[in-house]
Amino acid sequence: MEPLIDLNCSAIECTSLSPSAPIWQDVLAQAMTGELVAAMNYTALAEICDDPAEVADALEHAAGERGHAAAFAAEGRKIGVEVSNNVDAKYWKRLRESFMRCIADRDFIGCLIVQEIMLESFAVASYSRVGKVAPGSLGQTFAAIAAEEEEHVDHAMAILRAERALNAQRFDEKVHRLHLDVMTTLAKMLAKECKDGHCEVCHGNCVKPSLFDVSLSAAELRGASLQKYLKTLDMLGIPGEATLAWVAQLPV
């Protein structure tokens, strides 16, 4: 599939290509692809919203995610690499399909759970960690985008808490059902080994074994993402003994 963003749309002065540039290229590619999937998700969400304010909010989020993707592409150019994106890559396509099943059911709450609670928890935690170790403006960009994504989670919490207050058992069952679908895919994506083959985003071999060279690891990113996810579920009021069991059953 052709990339959704023109990676050569503007001329930015590049720094010299460092030995770690190919690693950051793949990290950026995963992040950029995730942002474009999020933009597609929010655009689809706008189409099922009845409230004009909700439509405008979803479209604003979509524009923000496209801006994040463009920022990641720009950071790649600064270090002399082209950042690819592939929203049809194996895992990202599955995540997109999970969201679109909620769209097909016109399940607004389900859409919020998938995008704002599950996918955004992953983004906030992983971007925050990358932001701490990536050099210069690359780290600053990841940290800044993590902070913006955190606002998306905060925005959804009031809506979802109100929904849970109507029927906690029904709400928790919905979250668990979506967890089995979406979080299983995310867990596989962050597993130590890609047991299902190449992820179709990394430009060469899987980047995960090389993450140690830039003070990262797949296990660390997975752990941070799951901790953020559990914290978010706790903020919703879902019992911790239940959510810990859910996470313990995810593939490793």
Predicted regions mapped to residue ranges:
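Non-heme di-metal
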Residues: M1-V252
